[in-house]
Amino acid sequence: MLIGEIKEPVSVLKGTGKVVLAQLERLNISTIGDILSYWPRLWEDRTQEQMFSQWTLAHRLQVRVSVTAHCWFGFGKSKTLKLVVQDGQGCVAELLCFRRNFLHFMFPVGSEAVVYGSFYEKDGLLESSSFDIEKIDCIEKKILPVYPLTKGLKQMKLRMLICAAMDQWIGTVDSELPKPILEKYHLLTKRDVLLSMHTPRTLDDVAKGKHSLIFEEFFSLQMTIGMRSLQKRGRLPLTQGESDQQSAIPSVVSELSLLQKKLHRCLPFELTVDQKRVITEITQDLEREEPMARLIQGDVGSGKTLVAFFSCLKIIEQGGQVALLAPTELLARQHADTAARLLAPIGIRLAFLTGNVKSEGRAYLLEALVAGEINLVVGTHALFSKSVRYHDLRLVIIDEQHRFGVLQRSALIQKGREGNPQGKTPHIIMMSATPIPRTLALSVFGDLDISIIKSMPGGRKPVITYIARKTKAEKVYEFVGNEIEKGRQAYFIYPRIHDIGLTDLKSVQCMYMYLKNYFARYAVAMIHSKMTEEEQQRIMKYFSEGTVHILVATSVVEVGVDVPNANCIVIEHAERFGLSALHQLRGRVGRGDVQSYCFLMHGDEMTECAKRRLKIMGSTADGFVIAEEDLKLRGPGDVGDTKNFEQSGYSGFRVADPVRDYPILQVAREAAFELLRKEKGSSEAR
């Protein structure tokens, strides 16, 4: 049977009283299957002996010693034993025996022992309070697993319980992976995995066991992803190789529909190679019977929205409706304004719907939607509220998709089914201005076809990034003033809205007053999330028109703000912002044909992680490189849509790491999809 099918309670093991059962419950261990698959977090190599001279802070030592003295420190009940020991080279160390004074009797002066532990240096001597000590004749040289614990539970007890479970049940365990997969990819059976993880003979055993477990976790997820895609679309997602082949499509102009050609002729610039390719990929998807599910990734300012509008026209020309969902009213308004500028002149009927649309206008808009008089509606979460109904919603475009939960996205998709005459699932395009690392793209977003826009519109110059201490603020302000004198505009970004007075963190409101006085000749405005949507829209309108020269803001301007004349952004307390946020904020400039500048101002004290973030920002402007580095710094659980994906079946990895184990992920994906293709072919043959 499979390990997860072993449902006997862990209480059948000897030595599991009420206290131990409660401890195991805190570790989510309630069955034999649970305890067998409770994997170690590391393994201690106790097969080799070292000398104290080989000590480093990063490693534990196993040393054969002789006890040379017993010392005591503290008074009364807190009196504690200190064992003084010496290795074969005469190097001395001290063992602080907190709550282990009984070692005084077990290891008298002159006795020999083997000590295993981590040491630190104090006053020229090595000391340890975290150690194991065994008599010479009792020592077993082996690889010991070390498990995550909970309060009161000891390693020795947990090891004993796991070994007892292994002795009784290991013979009943079958492998989750099919035998041909095990053989083709040289993987261990599940029984051998259990032996390699819990009772390894060598560290090589551990490596083989971990590799097989990692492959199994990735394979299981990719099978789920593949089956979901087959159910929804009748085909598997594109593999990396197939995506690369698609990227060879050189041109799109000849394949444009009538409305798309009209929009293309109106553009004052040429589409980039990547935009053309992605438009073709989407157009081909829209001509298929099964619903499209595609993620468009692009760096800041790469032109994803324009690609989405070209996609809209294909659907509208076929008589369908399109809904474009944005996470904030500010971003939704930006999209609506862009659509009005580009699509209204070629006859597209547009609407804008948010929670703030007044009742009279809202009633008319809802009637027009259900009557099919509106081709494209742009809005926020109001698009999937109960009162909104569609005539024939065939395409849903979700911008900044990571800001929406799976349930919210599903609600809008359900609206499409309800509003479709045949009850079909609408096509889905998700857009992300935060590049998603390839590692997460294959794991978390593996059931989507992925299009990548890397090439940037022509004529743009790379943003020059400066990293400076806060003491250089005056020079930075002076530089920005010179740029504004030339007719440019600037952003000043701060981590707080209000000055709370407990720290030296600058705030938007405080710096707005300061900068208004410093740049007295120019118009200075502020914007933050506590302002009403109407206030934010008014300020952004003034800034876009050039009436406001300097915008003091929080990260509310992180996405969706496109002002080509703004060429300076000053981010103060940059060490307080995440890598992704810094990259998005930097993307507010560099959108015109003039040289742009980003100033990352930091305080005197920074964590190592903050220093690393700023160093990365100074070394590259490639959003995909930054996304990979961000994933390394924060881990896969904190990046992208991982938590949202959990709602639809993703439960995370226990051993695998998509960053560290990316090569295994690629192989497991190919293996899973190959198996699904064979199964699909067999079922069709029948």
UniProtKB/Swiss-Prot annotation:
<feature type="region of interest" description="Wedge domain">
    <location>
        <begin position="47"/>
        <end position="141"/>
    </location>
</feature>
<keyword id="KW-0238">DNA-binding</keyword>
<dbReference type="InterPro" id="IPR047112">
    <property type="entry name" value="RecG/Mfd"/>
</dbReference>
<keyword id="KW-0234">DNA repair</keyword>
<dbReference type="GO" id="GO:0003677">
    <property type="term" value="F:DNA binding"/>
</dbReference>
<comment type="subunit">
    <text>Monomer.</text>
</comment>
<dbReference type="GO" id="GO:0006281">
    <property type="term" value="P:DNA repair"/>
</dbReference>
<dbReference type="InterPro" id="IPR033454">
    <property type="entry name" value="RecG_wedge"/>
</dbReference>
<feature type="binding site">
    <location>
        <begin position="298"/>
        <end position="305"/>
    </location>
    <ligand>
        <name>ATP</name>
    </ligand>
</feature>
<dbReference type="InterPro" id="IPR004609">
    <property type="entry name" value="ATP-dep_DNA_helicase_RecG"/>
</dbReference>
<comment type="function">
    <text>Plays a critical role in recombination and DNA repair. Helps process Holliday junction intermediates to mature products by catalyzing branch migration. Has replication fork regression activity, unwinds stalled or blocked replication forks to make a HJ that can be resolved. Has a DNA unwinding activity characteristic of a DNA helicase with 3'-5' polarity.</text>
</comment>
<dbReference type="GO" id="GO:0005524">
    <property type="term" value="F:ATP binding"/>
</dbReference>
<dbReference type="InterPro" id="IPR027417">
    <property type="entry name" value="P-loop_NTPase"/>
</dbReference>
<dbReference type="Pfam" id="PF00271">
    <property type="entry name" value="Helicase_C"/>
</dbReference>
<feature type="domain" description="Helicase C-terminal">
    <location>
        <begin position="472"/>
        <end position="632"/>
    </location>
</feature>
<feature type="short sequence motif" description="DEAH box">
    <location>
        <begin position="399"/>
        <end position="402"/>
    </location>
</feature>
<keyword id="KW-0378">Hydrolase</keyword>
<keyword id="KW-0227">DNA damage</keyword>
<dbReference type="Pfam" id="PF00270">
    <property type="entry name" value="DEAD"/>
</dbReference>
<dbReference type="InterPro" id="IPR045562">
    <property type="entry name" value="RecG_dom3_C"/>
</dbReference>
<keyword id="KW-0347">Helicase</keyword>
<keyword id="KW-0547">Nucleotide-binding</keyword>
<dbReference type="InterPro" id="IPR014001">
    <property type="entry name" value="Helicase_ATP-bd"/>
</dbReference>
<keyword id="KW-0233">DNA recombination</keyword>
<dbReference type="InterPro" id="IPR012340">
    <property type="entry name" value="NA-bd_OB-fold"/>
</dbReference>
<dbReference type="Pfam" id="PF17191">
    <property type="entry name" value="RecG_wedge"/>
</dbReference>
<protein>
    <recommendedName>
        <fullName>ATP-dependent DNA helicase RecG</fullName>
        <ecNumber>5.6.2.4</ecNumber>
    </recommendedName>
</protein>
<feature type="domain" description="Helicase ATP-binding">
    <location>
        <begin position="285"/>
        <end position="453"/>
    </location>
</feature>
<dbReference type="InterPro" id="IPR001650">
    <property type="entry name" value="Helicase_C-like"/>
</dbReference>
<dbReference type="Pfam" id="PF19833">
    <property type="entry name" value="RecG_dom3_C"/>
</dbReference>
<dbReference type="GO" id="GO:0006310">
    <property type="term" value="P:DNA recombination"/>
</dbReference>
<keyword id="KW-0413">Isomerase</keyword>
<comment type="similarity">
    <text>Belongs to the helicase family. RecG subfamily.</text>
</comment>
<dbReference type="GO" id="GO:0016887">
    <property type="term" value="F:ATP hydrolysis activity"/>
</dbReference>
<dbReference type="GO" id="GO:0003678">
    <property type="term" value="F:DNA helicase activity"/>
</dbReference>
<dbReference type="InterPro" id="IPR011545">
    <property type="entry name" value="DEAD/DEAH_box_helicase_dom"/>
</dbReference>
<keyword id="KW-0067">ATP-binding</keyword>
